[in-house]
Amino acid sequence: MASQLTDAFARKFYYLRLSITDVCNFRCTYCLPDGYKPSGVTNKGFLTVDEIRRVTRAFASLGTEKVRLTGGEPSLRRDFTDIIAAVRENDAIRQIAVTTNGYRLERDVANWRDAGLTGINVSVDSLDARQFHAITGQDKFNQVMAGIDAAFEAGFEKVKVNTVLMRDVNHHQLDTFLNWIQHRPIQLRFIELMETGEGSELFRKHHISGQVLRDELLRRGWIHQLRQRSDGPAQVFCHPDYAGEIGLIMPYEKDFCATCNRLRVSSIGKLHLCLFGEGGVNLRDLLEDDAQQQALEARISAALREKKQTHFLHQNNTGITQNLSYIGG
């Protein structure tokens, strides 16, 4: 194995977020309120299964232990199960997860698990069916809930649920969410609304700090857990009376970037050092043949020298990210 990916600030990178499409069939208010619109940049197509196999093999050789498949909506790819299996071929990758809107969970989750999937994150921004419809543009609440049940039936011991925290939309519904996870092994992750190039007005209207929830959880006796090295950025809390957990993802908090352990590759093969960074490093020309792996690893390692110490969201600089479907949120 080549040396562990490490940047100029001594951060080690064990976690790859790999977008496999930017297409999504939902129209979430904070991401794609007007629905998916194809970009000219994707005309040459999304990464193939072989390209995905090669890029994940290179990252694994550089110390990556966890791969999360993102989008867009990953399950819209007809070869999604094949993609999971291709990543699973590499024993160095211990965890393969997906972030999904849950649209196809009920139908396909057992097949995904058989192919090697080890973790699931489902986006659910409200437990009220009408509000869910209003946020996502899809009347699929019951279908998504059935999908979460199907994930447990397929053998997943825990399901993570992502909820974008929005003032005057769901921030006052903590008790409803806590009741939902009291007897279910769900890690409910509240994610602070983040400003994107297309979402400034929404951000100004609905952003609320996750610290409000953290203070309330601590007041109620929830206990802060320690992070593992390949975990995502959530601060996780548990409570002896609850089967579920609460996670808080607060990108505007001081020192959020200090524990960064993840890199991103877009659905067209660009390496992004930060969700809110500029540009990206093209890897696709080195994904054509297995013989290019050494050069691919060298390019990834060299690019990491340019990773900044922090994002610049506090300065209203959202970088290249126009919406969160672009490089996988």
UniProtKB/Swiss-Prot annotation:
Cofactor(s) the protein requires to work: [4Fe-4S] cluster
Disulfide feature: none
Classification via PROSITE patterns: MOAA_NIFB_PQQE, RADICAL_SAM
UniProt xrefs under InterPro entries: Aldolase_TIM, Elp3/MiaA/NifB-like_rSAM, MoaA, MoaA_NifB_PqqE_Fe-S-bd_CS, MoaA_twitch, MoCo_biosynth_MoaA/MoaC, rSAM
Reaction catalysis annotation: GTP + AH2 + S-adenosyl-L-methionine = (8S)-3',8-cyclo-7,8-dihydroguanosine 5'-triphosphate + 5'-deoxyadenosine + L-methionine + A + H(+)
Domain called Radical SAM core: residue spans: 8-234
Pfam families per UniProt: Fer4_12, Mob_synth_C, Radical_SAM
One Gene Ontology MF term: GTP binding
Residues annotated as binding GTP: R17, R68, T99, K160, R262, L263, R264
Residues reported to bind [4Fe-4S] cluster 1: C24, C28, C31
Cofactor: record remark: Binds 2 [4Fe-4S] clusters. Binds 1 [4Fe-4S] cluster coordinated with 3 cysteines and an exchangeable S-adenosyl-L-methionine and 1 [4Fe-4S] cluster coordinated with 3 cysteines and the GTP-derived substrate.
Binding site for S-adenosyl-L-methionine: Y30, G72, S123, M194
GO biological process: Mo-molybdopterin cofactor biosynthetic process
Superkingdom of this protein's organism: Bacteria
Metabolic or biological pathway, per its Swiss-Prot or TrEMBL entry: Cofactor biosynthesis; molybdopterin biosynthesis
Keyword terms of this UniProt record: 4Fe-4S, GTP-binding, Iron, Iron-sulfur, Lyase, Metal-binding, Molybdenum cofactor biosynthesis, Nucleotide-binding, S-adenosyl-L-methionine
Binding site for [4Fe-4S] cluster 2: C257, C260, C274
Keyword check for Lyase: yes
Parts of the chain that traverse the membrane: none
Top EC class, one word: lyase
UniProt-listed Enzyme Commission number(s): 4.1.99.22
Listed PANTHER family: GTP 3',8-CYCLASE, MOLYBDOPTERIN COFACTOR SYNTHESIS PROTEIN A
Family: Belongs to the radical SAM superfamily. MoaA family.
Quaternary structure and interacting proteins, as annotated: Monomer and homodimer.
Function: Catalyzes the cyclization of GTP to (8S)-3',8-cyclo-7,8-dihydroguanosine 5'-triphosphate.
Name of the protein in its database record: GTP 3',8-cyclase
Gene from which this protein is expressed: moaA
